[in-house]
Amino acid sequence: IDSETANVETMTNEVVDINNEAADNEGNVSGISDNEVIESEVKDNEIISNETVVKEIKAKEAAVPDRKKAEGKDYIFPPVTLLIKEQQTQSSGYEQYLKETALKLQQTLESFGVNVTITDISCGPSVTRYEMFPEQGTKVSKILSLTDDIKLNLAASDIRIEAPIPGKAAIGIEIPNKHNQTVHFRDLIESSTFEKFKSRLAFAVGKDIGGKTVVTDLAKMPHLLIAGATGSGKSVCINTLIMSILYKASPEEVKLIMVDPKMVELSIYNGIPHLLIPVVTDPKKASGALNWAVAEMTNRYKKFTETGVRNIEGYNKKVKELQKSGEIDPETIKKMPQIVIIIDELADLMMVAPGEVEDAIVRLSQLARAAGIHLVIATQRPSVNVITGLIKANVPSRIAFSVSSGVDSRTIIDMNGAEKLLGKGDMLFYPAGYSKPVRVQGAFISDSEISDVVEFLKENEDVAVYDTEVTEKIENKLNSAAISQEKDEYFEAAARFVIEKDKASIGMIQRMFKVGFNRAARIVDQLADAGIVGPEEGTKPRKVLMSSEQLEAYFEEYL
């Protein structure tokens, strides 16, 4: 009986609990059916679950910043949170150190009979510039001749004297900082200079001596040459250029062609939507890609002529107007994207196919600007046989990183100075239109940051769509080049001649056909490749390996 009584009490308590849960705000429970109680419980659960979902969504949105969408496009710009941010401050006694150095500099110059007044101190990320005004009658050349003495008295690793500073009545002496500050790429991307920059080809270069953000327009450069010794910061500079474009332009606006004979620097970008074709690592294919760009440039100019415009901006504006008015179908005639061709190591290409590569680069650099095609060329061997006079004359904008000698510096920027740079992104930035190069500390971006951005783009783009037409043209060019190693016009006659004489030598071919040594040597090599004559045997004539009948059979089959 006791257990039954306990069960009844438990059931009564449960009913009271249910009624309490179903009660309205005033505590009234009368007139509520069982079904209504159940429905109200379900609705309460729904409200709780919805609130939970909303909270989760808000938490995720707080973790990942707004992903800006390109106007009318599906491209989602990568968030800046994928990049590293680091607060860096100078030590408390640094201002005092700068004043002491300025005083020491002034005293050093006075000891050599040069009186100067320090007018300004500009502290940059890696270098501090002391601006000074010499007294009347002091020759600038005298200050320049004291470079080594200043270096000795200040115990500086290296100094650079800019005399005079462009636009100022002052001389600048640049001295390396005790502690260098890293310029992170995110600092440049988040700066108002970059955000307000209108061009789709904005390039966040770095920070100048005054600590100002330097952003330039690749479209106005219009081609760029980057050179410097190994490990000076060229590849990082190329990465900052590519990442600047990824943060500024959609794939419909800018397309990239990357040539990377080193195979390791740019391959990480395979799969991003901006790539026109996969990263080219074969130097032979690279010349094909450049030749395709020349053909594309010619094709674009034909379209400009047909539509009566002068450049890519005019063409795209006209297409937009015609699309709005409904005169043309947006699917059949589209806007032209700007194309940036990035070559990471020119020296490798110049070794494989110097003639073709140089011709293509010169043609593109002379004519491609208005067609919206821009070249970025990097090399670690700034010698005259890599950066030829023709290439230099047609690529007006330059970036010089640290090099070993003044000769290399003059090859890149036509003046000394790059040999005094510190390395690790320290550069002389010399775009078209500047009277003198500007010293800039290049931005740093790590491999992990690049990987994160590339992965983000791949996730949001599903599958990278490459232009198969371009790839096929490059492959066809390569295959036709391999097949069309055409035989010399004297090949048949020479083959019959050597079989008749039963021996073959370059001298025999020269005398018989009245050709030069090089051509005769090529004919003999072709005969050897065809299996008609044997290999070289020192100074002896080559052996003939075919009979007349075999030769005729060979001609029938292959020629």
Regions found by a protein language model. Give the residues of each.
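Low-complexity, intrinsically disordered P/S/T-rich segments
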Residues: 1-223
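Flexible hinge/switch segments at interdomain interfaces of large molecular machines
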Residues: 67-87, 119-127, 217, 225, ...
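P-loop NTPase motor-domain active sites and their immediate coupling elements
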Residues: 137, 169, 174-202, 209, ...
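The Walker A (P-loop) glycine that initiates the GxxxxGKT/S ATP-binding motif of P-loop NTPases
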Residues: 163, 228, 277, 511
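P-loop NTPase switch/communication element
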Residues: 219, 246-284, 288-289, 390
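Walker A (P-loop) phosphate-binding loop of P-loop NTPases
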Residues: 220, 230-231
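Conserved lysine of the Walker
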Residues: 234
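Hydrophobic positions on the alpha1 helix immediately C-terminal to the Walker A/P-loop
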Residues: 237, 241
